[in-house]
Swiss-Prot record:
It comes from Arabidopsis thaliana. The lineage of its organism: Eukaryota, Viridiplantae, Streptophyta, Embryophyta, Tracheophyta. It is an enzyme of class 2 (transferase). A lipid is attached at G2 (N-myristoyl glycine). The active site is at D178. One of its GO terms (biological process) is brassinosteroid mediated signaling pathway. InterPro entries: BSK, Kinase-like_dom_sf, Prot_kinase_dom, Ser-Thr/Tyr_kinase_cat_dom, TPR-like_helical_dom_sf. This is Serine/threonine-protein kinase BSK4. Belongs to the protein kinase superfamily. Ser/Thr protein kinase family. Its EC number is 2.7.11.1.
Length: 483
């Protein structure tokens, strides 16, 4: 990378015409059709969607210890959502919270995980956004499992996030709070998107930055306020993450840049993937964004223009570059249960459920062994009917068992399967979702949901449930082989 190092000294301020691009209307990352309109959700809806904000559904960076926790959930229409739950004192004035949320909720872009709605009941303050199923940039960049992120994909992340910020700026949202690798999410097709949660502060009077002070813009440390230029600085730290594959303080990176020590700066995993000129150009852009004086940093439009010219392998889909399966595909060959579900082979599904038995209900066995004899007898009669393929009778006895207040995910999936065999797909779906509420990581419940959704003609939702079930089953198998 040494041959072009002299370029580094030239910075792209917002006055530099070489990086300027004309305004482009109707860009691909503009308004997106098909995204639900911003709306209000009831607290009860969100409790059901998250199994009462169960720990298993926490997806935020610091888990349940974070002051504002993000959960994954599923609505009654089977759409997956992300829910940010603010701390009790974050937004005491509900009107102010609603006003801020509505402004962000007007944005609709393919480059963002769009805000779908809010909940403002009592002391609760919650935001609802599109769910992105393929983790965060931090996960893929700092904690990768099989292979590091490729150079072409890193450039794509940089471009897409810059386009997201440009879209926000063009629509009156010039400030983004605490931009970092955890704010970059990957959708079903593994395309990077910017979380809309960062467009609202964590509280009415709260801090705009929660990360280590070494990564915050210098002017924020001086004044406690952020500007559009502060967002550019944070974008520079993101470029630095992409360049190094590590989360290193900007001051250290700038020292390496000044010393022309670029070999130490760049991620060794990227060796041979880019030219000296391309590597030097990204280093230059990073350095420009990290300038101490805010006025010396480039504007977002010039960064978009510069990053467009660096793009590689633009014809290759993101999920291919990432080495991840596209939504609706399996990372490994499907299991017999997944194959039966995918092929709508209900008879084989019954046989597999019989083999599984009640081993996944072991934690709950005390609930019936110490309960009234009537409940035990009802379950046993239901099991006998299920084995005899008398599904009408199985439904009757399993219903008796559940009506007595018993809790069993296995009984619910068996009744769900019985409903499927009796051409009662809606009832089957309801039971499968209840089973998942009891055991959120049990793949069987998702397979039953997939089968029921397919019968109901909801093929896209069926395929998503099937893929999620396959992933959970693979994780369970992997965990069992490691023990």
């Amino acid at each position: 990378m040494g041959g072009q190092s002299s370029k580094i000294g030239t910075c792209c301020s917002h006055k530099t015409t070489a990086l300027e691009a004309p305004d482009v209307e109707n860009k691909e990352n503009g308004e997106v059709n098909g995204v639900h309109s911003f709306r209000e959700y009831s607290l009860e809806q969100l409790k059901i969607a998250t199994s009462c904000f169960a720990l298993e559904n926490v997806v935020s960076e610091h888990g349940e210890t974070a002051p504002n926790v993000v959960y994954q959930g599923k609505l009654e229409n089977h759409m997956k959502i992300a829910i940010k739950r603010f701390s009790g004192t974050a937004w005491p004035d509900p009107r102010q919270f609603l006003e801020e949320a509505r402004l962000v909720g007007q944005l609709r872009s393919k480059r963002m995980a769009n805000l779908l709605g809010y909940c403002c009941e009592g002391g609760e303050r919650l935001l609802v956004a599109e769910f992105m199923p393929n983790e965060t940039l931090a996960k893929h960049l700092f904690h990768w499992d099989t292979e590091p992120m490729k150079w072409a994909m890193r450039l794509r992340v940089a471009l897409y996030i810059s386009e997201a910020l440009e879209y926000c700026s063009n629509n009156g949202h010039t400030l983004y709070h605490d931009l970092n690798a955890y704010r970059v999410l990957f959708d079903e097709e593994c395309n990077p998107r910017l979380s809309t949660f960062g467009l609202m502060k964590n509280s009415r009077d709260g801090k705009s930055y929660s990360t280590n002070l070494a990564f915050t813009p210098p002017e924020y440390l001086r004044t406690g306020r952020i500007t559009a230029e502060s967002v550019i600085y944070s974008f520079g730290t993101l470029l630095l993450d992409l360049l190094t594959g590590k989360h290193i303080p900007p001051s250290h990176a700038l020292d390496l840049i000044r010393d022309r020590n670029l070999q130490t700066l760049t991620d060794s995993c990227l060796e041979g993937q880019f030219s000296d000129s391309d590597g030097t150009e990204l280093v230059r852009l990073t350095s420009c964004c990290l300038q101490y004086e805010a006025r010396e940093r480039p504007n977002i439009k010039s960064l978009v223009t510069a990053l467009i010219s660096l793009q590689k392998d633009t014809e290759v889909l993101s999920h291919v570059l990432m080495g991840l399966p596209q939504s609706g595909t399996f990372a490994s060959p499907p299991s017999p249960f997944a194959e039966a579900c995918s092929g709508k082979d209900l008879t084989s599904m019954v046989e597999i459920l019989e083999k599984i038995g009640y081993k996944d209900d072991e934690d709950l066995s005390f609930m019936w062994t110490e309960q009234m004899q009537e409940a035990i007898n009802s379950k046993k009669k239901g099991d006998i009917a299920f084995r005899r393929k008398d599904f009408s009778e199985a439904i009757e006895f399993y219903t008796q068992f559940l009506d007595l207040g018993m809790i069993s995910a296995t009984v619910l999936v068996r009744r769900s399967q019985s409903y499927l065999m009796s051409n009662m797909a809606k009832e089957a779906l309801d039971d499968a979702m209840k089973a998942q509420g009891i055991s959120p990581v049990w793949y069987v419940a998702l397979y039953l949901q997939s089968a029921a959704l397919s019968v109901l003609g909801m093929e896209k939702e069926s395929q998503i449930a099937l893929t999620e079930g396959s992933i959970l089953e693979a994780r369970k198998i992997s965990a069992s082989t490691q023990n």
